[in-house]
A protein has these predicted regions:
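Positively charged n-region of N-terminal signal peptides that target proteins for export
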Residues: 1-4
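Bacterial N-terminal signal peptides
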Residues: 6-15
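Predominantly a core beta-strand signature of beta-propeller blades
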Residues: 11, 60-61, 137
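Sec/Tat signal peptide C-region and signal peptidase I cleavage site
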Residues: 17-21
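N-terminal secretory signal peptides
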Residues: 22-64
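Active-site-proximal loop/helix of nucleotide/amide-processing enzymes and allied scaffolds
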Residues: 22-24, 74-86, 90-175
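Residue-level structural signal for beta-strand termini and adjacent loop
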Residues: 66-67, 133
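Catalytic phosphate/metal-binding cores of nucleic-acid and nucleotide-processing enzymes, i.e., regions
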Residues: 67-70, 77
């Protein structure tokens, strides 16, 4: 009975969709486990890997639509067997000429347009949460909390904050 109740609670939370301002601990742990597996491939091939996070009919977290992208983009296919709650992707291998430690404007725009939230893992081992409704970014955990690219150099090309509004992100990429 307790398992069924827990599954129902997870399913109802997932159906709430992008209006969720935050995440729950079970989702965060599942995302870290999933993205840590993809980080290794991302660093090896210097490509983004992406997909969708959702909840199955049985109330379990699952992924779908996994895709290999390019150096700076990735386009997963939305699975029909999940109630999708968020997108997720890696930011490829470390490159001193890219702002890969912060989600891009394209990342935020894609989540907002798709009606989802998003999760982004960076070469420095950061994990970001994108609220697709408010277009705000929150640093869930800092450098090294996830698998990091051995070539990562801190603060290149510049220092990274712990939260950004969409306007702040626009200024960051403009400056």
């Amino acid at each position: 009975m307790a398992n069924r109740l827990a599954a129902l609670v997870l399913l109802l939370a997932a159906l709430a969709g992008p209006a969720r301002a935050e995440w729950n601990d079970a989702e965060r742990k599942f995302v870290i486990q999933t993205l840590n597996q993809l980080q290794k491939l991302s660093f090896k091939h210097h490509r983004e890997y992406c997909g969708f996070l959702g909840v199955t009919a049985h109330g379990k977290f699952a992924t779908g639509g996994l895709s290999q992208g390019t150096l700076d983009s990735c386009f997963p296919t939305k699975p029909d067997y999940l109630t999708v709650t968020a997108s997720f992707h890696t930011h490829g291998g470390f490159d001193s000429t890219h702002w890969s430690e912060v989600p891009s404007l394209q990342d935020v725009d894609s989540d907002a347009a798709g009606g989802t939230n998003g999760w982004v893992a960076t070469p420095g081992g950061r994990l970001w949460f994108i609220n697709g409704t408010t277009r705000t970014l929150t640093l869930v955990c800092g450098p090294g909390c996830m698998i990091s690219d051995p070539n990562y150099v801190p603060n290149v090309p510049g220092p990274v904050g712990s939260a950004y509004t969409y306007d702040e992100l626009q200024r960051l990429f403009r400056d």
